[in-house]
Amino acid sequence: MSSKLPKKSEENLELPTFPASEESLSRSEKLKYVFVRNPFIPLGCLMTVGTFLASGYYIRRENHLMANKFMRYRVMSQGFTLAALAFSVLFIGPPRREAPSNSSGSINSEIKK
């Protein structure tokens, strides 16, 4: 009974590296990097904004029960966002940066300058 599933390897779990100079990236590339690195943080932000807007809608319609319910959902979505942020910091770690290119190939030459 052979399994057709690919074997997990550390190569598949590699996170993208952030370039040494952030000025070389466009906004869309930075946003793509954030979504790839931890998609739950932007998702939590969108959930928070959505529930906040929905509660505002129900406040204007004077449906205070639904407005209160969506305010509770907003607090839960903020908690989800903070949990995703904490998970990112604790388990994924800080973003890895590419090493700056050194023309001489030696660290000591940079120290002497």
Swiss-Prot record:
GO terms for cellular component: mitochondrial inner membrane; mitochondrion. Residues 1-27 are annotated as: Disordered. It is a multi-pass membrane protein. It comes from the Eukaryota. The chain crosses the membrane at residues 39-59, 75-95. InterPro entries: Hypoxia_induced_domain, RCF1. Keywords: Membrane, Mitochondrion, Transmembrane, Transmembrane helix. GO terms for biological process: mitochondrial cytochrome c oxidase assembly; mitochondrial respirasome assembly. The keyword Transmembrane helix applies. The keyword Ion transport does not apply. This is HIG1 domain-containing protein C25B8.07c, mitochondrial. It comes from Schizosaccharomyces pombe (strain 972 / ATCC 24843).
